[in-house]
A protein has these predicted regions:
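N-proximal low-complexity "stem/linker" segments adjacent to membrane-targeting elements
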Residues: 1-32
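C-terminal subregions of glycosyltransferases and related glycan-biosynthesis enzymes
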Residues: 1-6, 187, 194, 207-299
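Acidic helix N-cap motif at the loop->helix transition within catalytic regions
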Residues: 22-25, 50-58, 100, 104
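A conserved acidic beta->alpha catalytic loop
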Residues: 30, 45-54, 72, 96
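Glycine-rich, basic loop-to-helix element that forms the pyrophosphate-binding segment
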Residues: 70-87
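Conserved nucleotide-sugar donor-binding catalytic segment
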Residues: 85, 124, 143-227
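Short aromatic/hydrophobic "clamp" motif used to bind/position activated sugar donors
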Residues: 92
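Conserved donor NDP-sugar-binding/catalytic core segment of glycosyltransferases
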Residues: 104-137
Length: 299
């Protein structure tokens, strides 16, 4: 009698995009050429007005690629939630339109989750691609976190969404906060880490494209606003009573100093930096005055 082999789980890949026609081809091809073949690609086009649609339609003959175009513009994390509702797989991964994966990304993460049923989330290291210098560097040179990692995420968030794979059942209970445009993955993964053990694969399995030109004052303002909202909402919650939020405050202050440096307002800079006694962090901020703006964006 022939033994029935268990069918490998279907991985639903969510690719959210908005005016991303320039980069989509590389991203989509990195999915098509995965060594793991049981996947579906859900492309959620957030009402793009460039050549995004025409680039996606070049792949229309591939039945595993499903294209959905929204009738109106949504916040990024609302769009992610809407895309999740389109999925059929038992496993979920995320890939943004300007990034891409190594060919064994899905295979290695599916294997881990199949062999370790007590885990519902796995992520990995990645490579940073500097498009201006055409240079690749490692994202984290330190060992990534494993297990119960809530405080580690609060102290140094190193869980890039494009490296993650999650069991879909997580999204029956949890979702992205649709009010965020920048920190929605941070918010979700911190909430999940309170309940879930999380495993990291140390090998880099993805490539993240750095766009320095995107670090606008408007985007910095939004980042500050969202972190302040998150801090205010969660700082006094019972579930976080044993956790330290001091690093969130440091990030907020650093973003404020960056914004002032970009504006060139020296007086405002010193008033912001020296609100508190001099420390090593304040001395670091003073370097911002010396460095070119394009370097500040990278820090």
């Amino acid at each position: 009698m022939r033994e029935n082999k268990k069918k490998p789980p279907l991985v639903s890949i969510i690719l959210n995009c908005y005016n991303s026609g320039e980069f989509l081809k590389k991203s989509i091809k990195s999915v098509i050429f995965q060594s793991y073949k049981n996947w579906e690609l859900i492309i959620f086009d957030n009402c793009s007005n460039d050549n995004t649609k025409s680039e996606i339609l070049k792949f229309k003959k591939i039945k595993k690629i499903k294209y959905f175009r929204s009738k109106k513009f949504y916040s990024l994390y609302n769009a992610r939630n809407l895309a999740i509702k389109k999925t059929r797989g038992s496993l979920i991964s995320f890939l943004d339109a300007d990034d891409w994966w190594s060919k064994n990304k899905l295979k290695k993460q599916v294997k881990f989750l199949e062999q370790n049923k007590e885990y519902n989330i796995v992520y990995s290291n990645l490579y940073l691609f500097n498009e201006k210098k055409n240079k690749i560097s490692l994202f984290s040179k330190k060992k990534l976190y494993n297990g119960k990692i809530t405080q580690l995420l609060l102290d140094d968030f190193k869980m890039p969404i494009l490296t993650t794979m999650l069991r879909k059942k997580i999204f029956y209970k949890y979702s992205f906060d649709k009010n965020y445009n920048i920190i929605g993955d941070f918010d979700l993964f911190v909430r999940l880490s309170l309940k879930e053990k999380i495993f990291s694969i140390q090998e880099p399995l993805a490539f993240y494209r750095i766009h320095y030109s995107n670090m606008t004052t408007k985007k910095i303002d939004l980042h500050i606003s969202e972190l302040e909202k998150w801090f205010s909402k969660n700082n006094n919650k019972k579930k976080f009573k044993n956790y330290n939020f001091s690093n969130i405050q440091k990030i907020i202050k650093t973003l404020k100093v960056k914004k002032i440096c970009k504006s060139g307002d020296i007086l405002k800079f010193f008033l912001e930096v020296f609100k508190r006694p001099i420390n090593l962090l304040n001395l670091k901020y003073i370097l911002f005055l010396i460095l070119p703006k394009k370097i500040i964006d990278r820090l």
